[in-house]
UniProtKB/Swiss-Prot annotation:
Keywords: Plastid, Ribonucleoprotein, Ribosomal protein. Belongs to the bacterial ribosomal protein bL33 family. GO terms for biological process: translation. One of its GO terms (cellular component) is ribosome. The gene is rpl33. Its main location: plastid. It is found in: Plastid. HAMAP family: Ribosomal_bL33. GO terms for molecular function: structural constituent of ribosome. This is Large ribosomal subunit protein bL33c.
Length: 66
């Protein structure tokens, strides 16, 4: 039997600090995390505070489109 695709889907969280300060940073790259969320309970964009190895601090990571 095939399993139904539920409301839970994979999302990508991207560092908002790396995207904004891309022109004057020491390290190249953007921090991204992959996680899951329930689209029925959280229909709007998800934002979590995670550690960014490029900014060297905890900063808000926002959901991006695939």
């Amino acid at each position: 039997m095939e399993k139904k695709k539920g409301a839970r889907g994979n999302i990508i969280l991207e560092c908002t600090g790396c995207v904004r300060n891309s022109h004057n940073r020491v390290s190249k790259g953007v921090s991204r995390y992959i996680t899951q969320k329930n689209r029925h309970n959280t229909p709007n964009r998800l934002e979590l505070k995670k550690f960014c190895p490029h900014c060297y601090k905890h900063i808000i990571h926002g959901e991006i489109k695939k």
